Amino acid sequence: MKLTQRVLGMAPSLPRKLFDMAKEIGGDVIDLTLGDPDVPPPANVRAAACAAIEACQTRYSQNAGLHEAREAVAAFQRAQYGRDVAAEDVILTVGAMGSIFQQLFSLVEPGDEVIVPAPYWVNYVEVAKLCGAVPVVVSAREENGFSVTAEQVAAAITPRTRVIVVNSPNNPTGRVLREDAVRDIAALAVKHDLFVISDEVYRSLVYDGIPYLSIFDLPEMRGRCSVIDAVSKQFSMTGYRLGYTIGPRPLVETMTRLQENVNACAPLPSQYAAIAAYGPETDASYLFREYAARRQIVVDGIRDIPGLSLGGVDAAFYAFVNISATGMDSQSFAYGLLKEQRVAVVPGLAYGDAYDNFIRIAFTVSGERLREALGRLRAFTTQ
């Protein structure tokens, strides 16, 4: 059997590698690797999923998803964000990952370029390669709040550029892209006739009233921008595998044809759960309060550990911690921390070559476990 180079060239990601190592060690390991919260989804959402299964709603839906589920997403977008979105502008996918793959596969030809600001979620780069495109990484600096500048993006644009990926709030940094950076990217997209994919899966988790501007909502981006979102983070439903794209109808229609040949449709019980999640009876505010409390524990704890620094956490449930003062690279730090103190974090190198002096901490465990992890982290850096 001969396997393809396009797949053999995809190395296992560092987040998954550390996650797997933590599971293999087991015992009292505190796993802060994946963005997979331990808080349960709202009770009515769980009940809706169970009711769908009991009613044997376990077959196929339309390729783009149930009309009622797409309309539930559209209605939420209209009510929450004032967006002019109809069900026909929405396709439900197998998680946000499904949206990323299907969008890029629909938008780029082999040899086209995709601009990916870093630090980046690892899937953007790998999926671009899988589609035959060339990812062009633009590395943001910590002193700029991890927001790329207009000059950086402009310098990365070539005649082969087709797509710019925007991820705000950002994974892994937990930072929100500054408004001037958002407007600069929009201006460049218009000038060079580029499409922008806006990954907004953490939008519901912005803290302290920090201003948030979606590039999708700028009038000049109408028809040249899409949104990726999911129930995963907003409602703590990572295992339900239900994401979606909002975008121009030609893109949604193309993705629907692609989905027929890739996944058929998103899982039907999860679609019914999403209808409940976006319904008027759902209160997910407890999730926000829990993550906000954990964020404070992490921010206060990191700033009290010698050798570590943290610029800030605007949103999501990640802290991108600078470890430069320890003199260690990110992989040595992460592997050493796991071996010696049984705490699993992700090396910053996973999110771009420029970030080997960072680690990512996911505060997806209880406050008690976070405090224990911070104590072990202090012991590791001060030994």
Task: Give names to the regions the model predicted.
Residues 3, 8-9, 18, 22-30, ...:
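PLP-dependent class I/II
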Residues 11-13:
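Extracytoplasmic catalytic/substrate-binding loops of multi-pass membrane glycan-assembly enzymes
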Residues 57-60:
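A short acidic, glycine-rich active-site loop
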Residues 64-65:
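Short beta-strand to alpha-helix junction loop
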